[in-house]
Amino acid sequence: MNQKTILVLLILAVITIFALVCVLLVGRGGDGGEPSQLPHCPSVSPSAQPWTHPGQSQLFADLSREELTAVMRFLTQRLGPGLVDAAQARPSDNCVFSVELQLPPKAAALAHLDRGSPPPAREALAIVFFGRQPQPNVSELVVGPLPHPSYMRDVTVERHGGPLPYHRRPVLFQEYLDIDQMIFNRELPQASGLLHHCCFYKHRGRNLVTMTTAPRGLQSGDRATWFGLYYNISGAGFFLHHVGLELLVNHKALDPARWTIQKVFYQGRYYDSLAQLEAQFEAGLVNVVLIPDNGTGGSWSLKSPVPPGPAPPLQFYPQGPRFSVQGSRVASSLWTFSFGLGAFSGPRIFDVRFQGERLVYEISLQEALAIYGGNSPAAMTTRYVDGGFGMGKYTTPLTRGVDCPYLATYVDWHFLLESQAPKTIRDAFCVFEQNQGLPLRRHHSDLYSHYFGGLAETVLVVRSMSTLLNYDYVWDTVFHPSGAIEIRFYATGYISSAFLFGATGKYGNQVSEHTLGTVHTHSAHFKVDLDVAGLENWVWAEDMVFVPMAVPWSPEHQLQRLQVTRKLLEMEEQAAFLVGSATPRYLYLASNHSNKWGHPRGYRIQMLSFAGEPLPQNSSMARGFSWERYQLAVTQRKEEEPSSSSVFNQNDPWAPTVDFSDFINNETIAGKDLVAWVTAGFLHIPHAEDIPNTVTVGNGVGFFLRPYNFFDEDPSFYSADSIYFRGDQDAGACEVNPLACLPQAAACAPDLPAFSHGGFSHN
């Protein structure tokens, strides 16, 4: 081969290499070799989508920071200079405890929503502690109209029949601080010898923390609380590190200097005082168990012991979200509703419409309850009525990518509680659409003809979470394309524990060297104001029965034929079902309007609950949460029965401000505006796998609202997400199967916002 030929070949090789390099560079970005980027997915809904927000959409919106500020300014002017900031208030002070939305009367709200009447006055409800009056009391004041208040109306007598006794008031944060100061500065030094020996006691107990129990006493009028002491484990759950010491603090007096320790409990024995405990310890009469203050092998921490792995799965919206959130109003192609938070009762939704038709006026959490057992006084007496602490008040910021999908829409919540200025919980709600990874319906046919039809289950979810001391509750409202609404709550967080001593098998399981996981029940109560094709509804119960019969074509043989039983429930007592009693498998509210097939249009209440036994009715405090006895009760709706519980029930369950059982007074429920009251709950016997945290798996309960002859067929039949193809069609063609278009329709990268967290203090 001559040199000329070699030169030509070299030139051709160089040209080929250059061409290949150019091809490679075309496929790479112009930033020095990074791979080309997919376009970002749209971050907003396409403008052509049909859903819109009606002008009256903010009727149920929680109060804004500006409204809260205006109410507080007005109350300060009207109540005078003696008003103290609740953040620093002592029991003998006057202070504004809370301000929140006063919900409008239903008749006025519907007149506005449905008939265009002027909106009802926007009002606030304030709870005020009057500790400086000759007869200290608690008052409820309605303030309006907002945003420029001009009147204040005391509704305490109207709603409760008289002034609210002062001992029923919730415990302020300042009161807890004063109790801690009393315990650590005045009381614990009296037992410093024992505490040094057992618990690595430091000056004024700085390595220890207290945890409250409730209710506070044994009879109406008491205000005496058992406090457990725990190691203060930084960055982890102290709830698992009980040191075995519990103190009964009487804090009824208006002057904290007069508060006393009524009883002491230490590792299985009772004492009259810490001084007595110390004296017996010095005399060698106390059996002391030395408890390490560094946890048990780190299993108490939520920090993973392994490094991060590959990124987990991520759902995104390839063509932008298919819903919108404006203020408190959510709208999608199927659903519209308003959402909010009661400061004490927690999450609630209003004016729920499916394809434009109202199904529900209100679904709201009313109360949550945890009843404990154990062989220590704190464990055996604890009945946490969480509304007394505040399921809205203790709502927490939602952590993007853990508490909700990373790309969910996050909404803040403004509140005014124990403060003179409003605060904000960032990311208190999340709203998202989610593919459940499950078909809502489907059929694959190989019989006579060949076809497939189905619809992926895609739901719209609004979520919030509350952390009540050790437990975290997840509150979900799920909207399904079939017209069903699902209400679900989950429990997670840390278990409440007790110091391990004596015969503990009756009260739970040992979960670490010195820790008993104490048995308890969880229950939550919900108000469901269904308006099924109008305000006039009836309650129907349907079930099944096997009826013996002779076989028609062979009379000598017997057959058990399955039949449907139907019964109209006409009185409240008929529609009140106790926990553990037989409940109709189908119970639904129906209108006097029929569907195409002649059946009354109805919505079924389907419960998913495995509640523990309710507190026996002969208990002195059972009236304080009498709703717990009923898995379901349907009553006439009344404005004077807005809630099944009260923020004041926690501290006086013996003479409760609201007794739900009074709602069930055997009035007619035929053709009336009705409310269904639903209880969901479960028994929790803590076990080793509850360490470090209880998991949500298997610890979620709730109920469904499902259409029952409300439509003429399944409304999801009309879903644009439906898939259908025959055996003689090309299922890989876009015009046949929309899923075949995904490689093009979803060829985008989700626009992930930078991670942020709402923080650990509210601003």
Curated annotation (Swiss-Prot):
The chain crosses the membrane at residues 6-26. InterPro entries: Cu_Am_Ox_Cu-bd (IPR049947), Cu_Am_ox_TPQ-bd (IPR049948), Cu_amine_oxidase (IPR000269), Cu_amine_oxidase_C (IPR015798), Cu_amine_oxidase_C_sf (IPR036460), Cu_amine_oxidase_N-reg (IPR016182), Cu_amine_oxidase_N2 (IPR015800), Cu_amine_oxidase_N3 (IPR015802). GO terms for molecular function: calcium ion binding; copper ion binding; identical protein binding; primary methylamine oxidase activity; protein heterodimerization activity; quinone binding. The active site is at 386 (proton acceptor), 471 (schiff-base intermediate with substrate). Disulfide bonds join 198-199, 404-430, 734-741. GO terms for cellular component: cell surface; cytoplasm; early endosome; endoplasmic reticulum; Golgi apparatus; membrane; microvillus; plasma membrane. Strongly expressed on the high endothelial venules of peripheral lymph nodes and on hepatic endothelia. Also highly expressed in appendix, lung and small intestine. Expressed also in adipose tissue, in bone marrow, colon, heart, kidney, ovary, pancreas, placenta, prostate, skeletal muscle, spleen and testis. Isoform 2 seems to be the predominant transcript in fetal kidneys, fetal cartilage and fetal tonsils. The highest relative expression of isoform 2 occurs in skeletal muscle, heart, pancreas, kidney, and lung. GO terms for biological process: amine metabolic process; cell adhesion; inflammatory response. Residues 27-763 are extracellular. SUPFAM superfamilies: Amine oxidase catalytic domain, Amine oxidase N-terminal region. Homodimer; disulfide-linked. Can heterodimerize with isoform 2 leading to reduced surface expression. Probably forms heterodimers with AOC2. This is Amine oxidase [copper-containing] 3. It comes from Homo sapiens.
